[in-house]
């Protein structure tokens, strides 16, 4: 479980650092989408809190990380689909977001956190029930 804690803490730390970098360098989020900036601040705070929680109450923190990453991923995908500021064409805003490497990196990191947390929950339950293609045969 220690390895899972380290990997999950690293992923949450990367998520928090990328979020901080976006907040520090993205002028558009502060000028055109202030509520998005506040939401990102909340997600950064949750990521930082979950880093410490993973080492104290692992099961609750893993579930919290899954929920936080899921909500953040859905919110970010919602921004891509229809979260453009007033007066700006959706395609322009979508291209702006998808050209921003920090945004795409944060989006990818949320998927990674979700995969880690689901894997942490699922692996103990799969013991002895691996699909045939994944089963290691020992003679």
Residue ranges and their predicted role:
Residues 1-139:
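Topology signature of small-to-medium multi-pass alpha-helical membrane proteins
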């Amino acid at each position: 479980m220690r390895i899972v804690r380290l990997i999950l803490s690293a992923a949450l730390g990367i998520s928090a650092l990328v979020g901080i970098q976006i907040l520090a360098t993205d002028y558009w989020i502060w000028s055109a989408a202030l509520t998005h900036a506040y939401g990102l601040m909340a997600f950064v705070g949750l990521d930082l809190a979950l880093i410490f929680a993973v080492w104290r109450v692992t099961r609750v923190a893993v579930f919290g990380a899954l929920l936080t990453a899921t909500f953040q991923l859905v919110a970010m995908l919602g921004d891509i689909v229809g979260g453009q500021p007033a007066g700006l064409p959706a395609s322009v805003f979508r291209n702006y977001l998808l050209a921003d490497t920090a945004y795409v990196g944060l989006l990818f990191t949320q998927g990674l956190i979700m995969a880690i947390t689901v894997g942490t929950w699922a692996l103990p339950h799969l013991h002895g029930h691996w699909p045939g293609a994944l089963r290691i045969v020992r003679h």
